[in-house]
Amino acid sequence: QRQMCIRDRNNFVQAIDKWETRWKEPFRITQNIGRGVVFTGNDKWKNYSVSSKLNFHLVKSGGLIARVQGLKRYYALEVTAQNKLRIAKMYYDLEILKEIDFDFEFFTDYNLTLQVNNGHIKGYLDDKLIIEVEDKNNPLDFGGAGIVAEDGTICTDQISVS
């Protein structure tokens, strides 16, 4: 299986308030109000995993996104400031597909992986499966990968797709 490690910000669509180069992390994105995303990929990306070691700075929620088909269509594996970990589907409006309790702390690194395989969506923490769901209601079948931040800042050194 091929793995691609992305560290070059020029390969990304940016729909975010701030993505500055003055920080040590190549990916340090801030969305002041609402949800902002950065992503790469195309409609040939179907079944894959996206992984990253993410650090969250005072966000309402944030995490990884997969099968991105624009700003309003994607799956997300997110942590929230309300101590939840969830798999969500953005299909013009945000739908929480599954949510579990999660002991979340700001300014802490989390190794997350979001895996999409047909209608099955799985979330991993430190390579351990911790949440999964099947989307049977108009599933997203293809699209790019990236990260999402809601009302705050998240950062990472790289995003891996395999």
State where each predicted segment sits.
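Short, small-residue-biased leader/transition segments that mark boundaries at the very start
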Residues: 1-6
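Flexible glycan-contacting loops in extracellular carbohydrate-active proteins
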Residues: 133-158
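Generic beta-strand structural signal
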Residues: 21, 79-81, 116-118
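Carbohydrate-binding surfaces in secreted/extracellular proteins
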Residues: 52, 106-134
